[in-house]
Amino acid sequence: MEERFPIPAGLSDCLQTEYGFVLRDIAPAERGFYGETWKIRTHAGAYFAKLDRWPCHKESYRASLPIVQYIADGGIAFVPRVIATRRGQLCCAFQGGILAVFAFAPGALLEEYAVEDLYGCLSQVYALRTDGLALEAEDFGCAIPQTCARLAQAPELPDAARVALEKRQSAIARYANRLARFSAICQKDRSDFHITHGDAGGNFLSDGKQFFLVDWDSVKLAPIERDAWVFMSNPAQLCAIQRTINQNGIAYSLRWERLCYYSYFYFFSYLEGYLSSILSAAQERRGAQIAADMAAYLADSWIYARLDAADASVTENSLAASFAQAEKTPCKSAGSTLQ
């Protein structure tokens, strides 16, 4: 459920000082986990302002802004442009956080969409040149389980979080071993990298006329599987993604070992996000709520279907076989989400 945060004291003054905005209206907007977001109306039009205060995340938010601007400069209209401050900066400091303003994107988050629509958009981003781009590149590392283990030893971690981790101890160890295995396989080939979003399906918007893809905080130079792994348990969807990117000029074939790697990696990435957020939460009540969310994530969440598919592929190579079968089977397009 999306939270709506109140308007902080001084935000209007900051926007006027840093951006020269004459505000007509400001109101909380739907936001993700880390960012506090507001819709602002000015004499020049409407914008979104997003503030990230989290010590464990705000620097990645700051680092993503030049990449967002590069994408927008490349003619990608569905990625809202970053609005520069009066001094030409892409962000400013506010109450210990990073504040940035974006062009207004009308519409709402799509709970359901055709993968052809999403990957038709992403293909335009994948087609952008990346040589000389100052962007972190994928290394297919496998150290993240150790990071999670270190965070789990923090004395201030709530008991509820410790209990949740103990209940999944054997599964966590198995996933760590699988991650190490696929890390070793994937590190042998670091070719065919593109600008990837990292959570595209959760940030795909539409107003019925056009699409928007927002929140590029986790942008990275990586293979397309970094975006596609969420469809790991649905070979027909992977088939549709494959066909869509190829039809849009991206000469690449999805690789099952990379899909497996990201399934295991993101299990730990989300876990690390929970643990880091619990430990850096400004309020004890907020930390307790995140601990409860982490317990629910570990107990039963959408990611286990992807992990089950990856596990099956390790023992039976069933993912590669089912994906190959899906490629041979004509996939009827679900049609565009747009009317």
Model-predicted regions and their roles:
Residues M1-A84, Q210, L319, F323-A326, ...:
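Conserved NTP-binding catalytic cores of kinases and kinase-like/nucleotidyltransferase enzymes
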Residues E112-K167:
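A cross-family kinase active-site recognition segment
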Residues D189-H194:
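Protein kinase catalytic-loop region centered on the HRD/HxD motif
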Residues I195, S206-E257:
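Active-site Asp-x-Gly
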Residues G202-F204:
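Catalytic-loop signature of eukaryotic-like protein kinases
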